[in-house]
């Protein structure tokens, strides 16, 4: 009795592994878009508010205070991580495009993509988590250490910072997806 499914073509050679570089290129394009948008939103997060003081009458009743992303090391770390991710995604998009246009890609390039994507995923996840925790402290405060919430005063600033942290988390998920995709592609080529 003969089987109706064929694993090998008539010539006897194995079926070539699927070329997933089109998907890889698309994910890297999404990574660039998410990193650039998070970067722009973070850089534009500045707000100035007049805050009342409890000083005696000869002193001003209100003080003008700025909220900027530069005031927090966590947000500076997020800025650097997003900048590096933008640069990295451009470089790897070029490499992915070169892999699409070449007839066969080397397992060595796939291995380097897996390693570098994993490192970048770790950097982006840590930066997004750090910025998210500081944004949460700004939103809710911490009564145990007398840190007051500031998002009731600096609402626009908090929206920008929170949105940037959320989109950065999307960039980390895209990087993890790229690690999985490159690992699968490498596995299929080396089998």
Curated annotation (Swiss-Prot):
Bilayer-spanning residue ranges: 23-43, 74-94, 119-139, 161-181
Keyword list, A-Z: Cell membrane, Membrane, Transmembrane, Transmembrane helix
UniProt topology in membrane: Multi-pass membrane protein
Residue ranges, Cytoplasmic side: 1-22, 95-118, 182-191
One matching Pfam family: CASP_dom
Gene Ontology CC: one annotated term: plasma membrane
Compartments, record wording: Cell membrane
InterPro entries hit by this protein: CASP/CASPL, CASP_dom, CASPL
Family the UniProt entry places it in: Belongs to the Casparian strip membrane proteins (CASP) family.
Protein name, per record: CASP-like protein 1D1
Upper classification of the organism: Eukaryota, Viridiplantae, Streptophyta, Embryophyta, Tracheophyta
């Amino acid at each position: 009795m003969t089987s109706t499914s064929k694993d090998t073509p008539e010539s006897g050679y194995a079926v070539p592994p699927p070329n997933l570089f089109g998907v890889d290129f698309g994910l890297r394009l999404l990574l660039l878009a998410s990193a650039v948008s998070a970067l722009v939103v973070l850089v534009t997060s500045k707000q100035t508010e007049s805050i009342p003081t409890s000083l005696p009458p000869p002193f001003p009743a209100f003080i003008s205070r700025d909220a900027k992303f530069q005031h927090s090391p966590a947000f500076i770390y997020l800025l650097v991580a997003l900048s590096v991710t933008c640069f990295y995604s451009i470089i790897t998009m070029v490499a992915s495009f070169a892999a699409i246009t070449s007839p066969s890609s080397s397992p060595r390039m796939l291995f380097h993509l897996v390693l570098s994507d994993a490192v970048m995923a770790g950097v982006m996840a840590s930066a997004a988590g750090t910025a998210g925790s500081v944004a949460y402290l700004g939103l809710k405060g911490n009564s145990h250490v007398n840190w007051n919430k500031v998002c009731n005063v600096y609402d626009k600033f908090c929206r920008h910072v929170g949105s940037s942290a959320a989109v950065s988390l999307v960039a980390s998920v895209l990087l993890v997806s790229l690690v999985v995709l490159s690992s699968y592609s490498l596995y299929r080529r080396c089998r």
